[in-house]
Design a protein with these regions (language model features):
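Transmembrane helical segments that form the transport core of multi-pass membrane transport proteins
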Residues: 221-272, 280
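Membrane-water interface at transmembrane helix exits
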Residues: 29, 40, 69, 73-77, ...
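A short amphipathic helical element positioned immediately N-terminal to and/or at the very start
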Residues: 37-45, 213-226
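Membrane-helix interface segments
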Residues: 10-11, 47-49, 78-87, 118-119, ...
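Membrane-embedded helical hairpins/re-entrant loop segments and their flanking transmembrane helices
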Residues: 64-94, 252-269
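Transmembrane helix-loop-helix hairpins in multi-pass inner-membrane proteins
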Residues: 1-41, 92-204, 282, 286-345
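Membrane-interface helix starts
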Residues: 13-16, 45-53, 222-236
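Hydrophobic alpha-helical transmembrane segments
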Residues: 51-55, 82, 86, 123, ...
Length: 345
């Protein structure tokens, strides 16, 4: 694992990413322009305390991601503190946006490397954090579907009927990712398939890098999965993180007085929305969520209503979170200067 794999976003890339983010935001505002009067009217109904409650729930997501990072990294660095875990969470959120979705892990690896964790194990642990997240998304959506599939079947028409197909596709991808981490058989299959890459110097170098990453991933997964109590803590934190995120649309709907949808119905719809968004392309976390949200909730809310809820939901779960992560990222850099790298356990 090379030093280049762990890096901070450059100032030039950050500026370019912010300009892209601004352009995407302008596109969304333009798409919503025909319903802007309804959106502003719905937002104007909110009290200060309601807005603060929604924003607080939105900020719980990156904070809980930091808690997950803390629990995972302590399997390697017992002296790794909760504050450092929160730093890693903020670095991931900030890096994901300013590198247009490509740099969350490299930014986190830079921090972890400075904190004393080797690049290989660090990459393995951050990959496993992602796998735990995807697995929890799959389990959460599956439980919600099992408990409420009759209600969903009775209240969906048109394009929503394709949800089971989208669910199956994403589920297969997530299961394959999990097996790649935990199954020696699948790992050996992956090594065998890598042997069919072109015999050029460029592709053989990539093959060597991927084989090294696969070896590290297998080692770290065996080490982490052997610690069952730690895995249960990780799943519990991941589930709590998703629960808070899925509460956001319900709070938005209730505070705006828009729909009689029940709490658990909104939990189901939001879990499906996040699930479907995994199958859609995105830039810096934008595009896929908006499309999936309009698709799923559009069957239960009027067009102006669903856009109003989406606007508040994205302000709380994306824009405010990104602004907070920018502050958190620069605080994390100050922490790096102060810390003495601990030894791996």
């Amino acid at each position: 694992m090379s030093q280049a794999a762990a890096q901070q976003p450059s100032r030039k890339k950050t500026v370019i990413s912010l300009l892209v983010l601004l352009a995407l935001t302008c596109i969304i505002v333009f798409i919503f322009k025909d319903h802007w009067a309804e959106i502003t009217m719905a937002l104007a109904q909110l009290s200060v305390w309601q807005v603060l409650a929604v924003l607080a729930v939105g900020l719980s997501y990156p904070l809980l991601e930091g808690c997950v990072a803390w629990v995972i990294v302590r399997s390697r660095l017992p002296q790794f503190t909760l504050r450092q875990g929160l730093d890693v969470g903020w670095c991931g959120t900030f890096g994901n946006v300013v590198t247009l979705g490509a740099g969350a892990v490299p930014v986190q690896l830079y921090y972890l490397h400075k904190a004393g964790l080797s690049l290989g194990p660090g990459a393995g642990l951050m990959t496993l954090e992602y796998v735990f997240h995807k697995t929890t998304v799959l389990l959460y959506a599956t439980v919600m579907l099992l408990l409420q599939h009759r209600w969903l079947s009775a209240n969906t028409t048109g394009v929503m009927r394709y949800l089971p197909m989208a669910y199956a596709v994403v589920a297969v991808i997530i299961v394959a990712l999990v097996l790649l981490c935990v199954s020696p058989l699948v790992q050996n299959l992956a090594r065998w398939l890598l042997g069919f890459l072109p015999k050029t110097e460029k592709w053989q170098q990539r093959r060597a890098d991927w084989l090294e990453q696969l070896e590290v991933l297998g080692t770290e997964s065996r080490r982490l999965l052997a610690d069952k109590p730690r895995c249960l803590k990780i799943f519990a934190l991941q589930a709590l993180k998703l629960f808070g995120l899925f509460c956001l649309p319900y709070l938005c709907i209730r505070f705006m007085g828009l729909s009689p949808l029940g709490f658990w119905q909104v939990q189901l719809l939001t879990s499906l929305m996040l699930f479907v968004s995994n199958a859609l392309p995105n830039v810096a976390g934008m595009g896929s969520i908006e499309t999936a949200f309009l698709l799923v909730f559009g069957s239960f809310l009027e067009q102006g209503e669903v856009m109003s809820v989406l606007m508040l939901y994205r302000i709380a779960s994306y824009y405010v979170v990104f602004a907070a992560s920018a502050v958190g990222f620069f605080i994390a850099q100050r922490h790096l200067v102060q810390m003495e790298p601990p030894k791996e356990g």
